[in-house]
Amino acid sequence: MIVIFVDFDYFFAQVEEVLNPQYKGKPLVVCVYSGRTKTSGAVATANYEARKLGVKAGMPIIKAMQIAPSAIYVPMRKPIYEAFSNRIMNLLNKHADKIEVASIDEAYLDVTNKVEGNFENGIELARKIKQEILEKEKITVTVGVAPNKILAKIIADKSKPNGLGVIRPTEVQDFLNELDIDEIPGIGSVLARRLNELGIQKLRDILSKNYNELEKITGKAKALYLLKLAQNKYSEPVENKSKIPHGRYLTLPYNTRDVKVILPYLKKAINEAYNKVNGIPMRITVIAIMEDLDILSKGKKFKHGISIDNAYKVAEDLLRELLVRDKRRNVRRIGVKLDNIIINKTNLSDFFDI
């Protein structure tokens, strides 16, 4: 397998730089404002100039302004970023056998057949992709090329920004042997510290530890994931799906618990959510915003996806379960969220259109 992982560099801030060239080279911070005060809210992302000053994603805006008072602060404009993402994802799709959209600014491409199994041709394709995105959208991306998804992401992370990282099949074992445990996707800082305490500093240390002890710390799924990666047996395929959820929420005419009143709005939310996707969701979640603005949710996963016709009945059942769980409060808003979309790749452009 030949996988190309594409990561759009500091995406939201970079789009703002493209649309506002005067921002280029200056500290730029994209913010999500809460609206309570002029400085309330959090940092969504920052360009590298702002990061050098200590600004980080998730940081309160007021703190960012204290450490980087001269930076440019702009509000997040998600529809614009989505439009850029859609165009880039469609471009990527043209170069892939399969495309798995991991987020608004990340995607995995299986290009094995496209390059006829020739790894060096895969590297050349990655270069072509970088250049094409730059020419058409003025956006730099970092790309990783490797024999599997995880390695492609890791080498891309090591190559930021605007880089091209490569792990050839002959280099995989040496790379795995020297890989720090905290560099592995899915291993957060807290879990990494616990693994360090067990004597696991490098991925290779997994092979010399008691598997049952590892499982107690990480859980079954993650222990198996780490073991397969350490043994160089990780082979999860790239799938034609999107991990970007699609949702729709509607305000009821009045606060109520009456299912007959809520259902038409829930059905409308389902219709509008399904209209956003070109494919079949594997998970559906009903979300109820209560009269006191508390949020309740209940979801269900389907191995082979769920059609819109079946979604109506499933959503009604989930709604009734929520109302049984909360027997007192009225519902103010009702919504539905669709996750893990199995993409209809033959018409992928419809999936990404806003």
Curated annotation (Swiss-Prot):
One record GO biological process: DNA-templated DNA replication
Transmembrane portions of the chain? none
Alphabetical list of Gene3D superfamilies matching this protein: 3.30.70.270, 3.40.1170.60, 5' to 3' exonuclease, C-terminal subdomain, DNA polymerase, Y-family, little finger domain
Q: How is the cofactor bound?
A: Binds 2 magnesium ions per subunit.
Hey, where's the site called Substrate discrimination on this chain? F12
Catalytic residues, chain numbering: E106
Q: Which GO terms describe its cellular component?
A: cytoplasm
Asked if the keyword Manganese belongs to this entry, the reply reads no
Annotated localization: Cytoplasm
The protein's annotated catalytic reaction(s) are: DNA(n) + a 2'-deoxyribonucleoside 5'-triphosphate = DNA(n+1) + diphosphate
Q: What is its EC number?
A: 2.7.7.7
Q: Which residues bind Mg(2+)?
A: D7, D105
Q: Which Pfam families match?
A: IMS (PF00817), IMS_HHH (PF11798)
Superkingdom of origin: Archaea
Q: Where is the UmuC domain?
A: 3-188
Q: Which cofactor does it need?
A: Mg(2+)
Q: Which UniProt keywords apply?
A: Cytoplasm, DNA damage, DNA repair, DNA replication, DNA-binding, DNA-directed DNA polymerase, Magnesium, Metal-binding, Mutator protein, Nucleotidyltransferase, Transferase
Provide a Gene Ontology MF annotation, just one. Answer: damaged DNA binding
Q: Which family does it belong to?
A: Belongs to the DNA polymerase type-Y family.
Stored PANTHER family: DNA POLYMERASE KAPPA (PTHR11076:SF33), DNA REPAIR POLYMERASE UMUC / TRANSFERASE FAMILY MEMBER (PTHR11076)
What is its biological role?
A: Poorly processive, error-prone DNA polymerase involved in untargeted mutagenesis. Copies undamaged DNA at stalled replication forks, which arise in vivo from mismatched or misaligned primer ends. These misaligned primers can be extended by PolIV. Exhibits no 3'-5' exonuclease (proofreading) activity. May be involved in translesional synthesis.
Q: Give the record's subunit note.
A: Monomer.
- Record remark on domains: The catalytic core consists of fingers, palm and thumb subdomains, but the fingers and thumb subdomains are much smaller than in high-fidelity polymerases; residues from five sequence motifs of the Y-family cluster around an active site cleft that can accommodate DNA and nucleotide substrates with relaxed geometric constraints, with consequently higher rates of misincorporation and low processivity. It lacks the O helices present in high-fidelity DNA polymerases in the fingers domain.
By what name is this protein known? DNA polymerase IV
What is the primary gene name for this protein? Answer: dbh
